[in-house]
Amino acid sequence: WHREATGQKVRYVPAWLPDLMRTPAVIAYQAQSSDQERRRLQRQTDRRLTVSRQPETDIEMCMPLQTLEIFAQGAGNWTGLRAQDRREQLAHIATTVEELYPSFRMYLFDGRKRFAPPMMIFGYLKAAVYTGETYLLIRSKQLIRDLAQGFDAHIRHADVHAHEAADWVRQLKTT
């Protein structure tokens, strides 16, 4: 899907942490001791990071800032992930956001005020909404436009803008 959308804007709302920025420790934690799942997640991370580094890439990512706060605290799904691993993950996110900017732009909104389902919008060609175990693929031009407009509204209402994102992630304290 990324290849088909080369040269077009990709809009991205991650389900958890941004896939392309996961560290090996976070991948291992998410894989829950399954070597096969760990390898699959690592390949996915590597592929998405490679695509993001290509010069024709234009990716906007928007997510609730609370997702990163919960991660830093080691709460919710992240209970049990060592504080050191979480610190390293946050540092990796900040560094990667800086490295890829401006072709990759991360925006953070207040999840108490707005909601966005996990999804990727590939230009105006297609959209994939993550439903937990699978993706709902959308090809309707009008639905894709509606999703893109909703995504753009999240950017307009962002509390943390792309040029501030790396510094905002760095200020998070792990507990």
Mark where each language-model region is.
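Hydrophobic protein-protein interaction segments
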Residues: H2-T174
